[in-house]
């Protein structure tokens, strides 16, 4: 009986899981990626969120951004894993999947000289995360250092929606 139970467990463990609604993918964020990102989202309201696997506040904020993305499909949501501590793609992808951000455009810093990448985004940025940059339709950028409050994101979204009327 014990062998039968162990065999059943082994069989269940080998079966594929339920298909994910959408599998997250990571693009490599390297020199020139910031300008490429801005160019590809030009004319659309875009929320760019810098986060990291080892960032405590990011673990709380990512699911909130997933909810924001679900409620506001007119906003392009981009996440960039800019962790100071190198981490695996699998860890980042797992967090994005859990947070409901699989359908977002997801990037990961891929240059060993992260300071150069941060400088391209904002010359004054010292690497603190979480960090959110809200890019309006006309390219105007608003930076939120630390956790982005849901009310601030909603206010920005309402301004973007009003600008199209």
Per-region residue spans from a language model:
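Bacterial N-terminal signal peptides that target proteins for export
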Residues: 1-6
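Conserved redox-active cysteine motifs that mediate thiol-disulfide chemistry
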Residues: 50-64
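Short, internal strand/loop/helix patches
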Residues: 95-129
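Hydrophobic h-region of N-terminal signal peptides that target proteins for export
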Residues: 9-17
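Structural microenvironment flanking redox-active thiols in thiol-disulfide oxidoreductases
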Residues: 60-100, 113-117
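Hydrophobic beta-strand anchors of alpha/beta hydrolase catalytic cores
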Residues: 47-48, 77
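A short beta-strand-turn-helix
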Residues: 25-46
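Thiol-/selenol-based redox modules, centered on thioredoxin-like
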Residues: 128-165
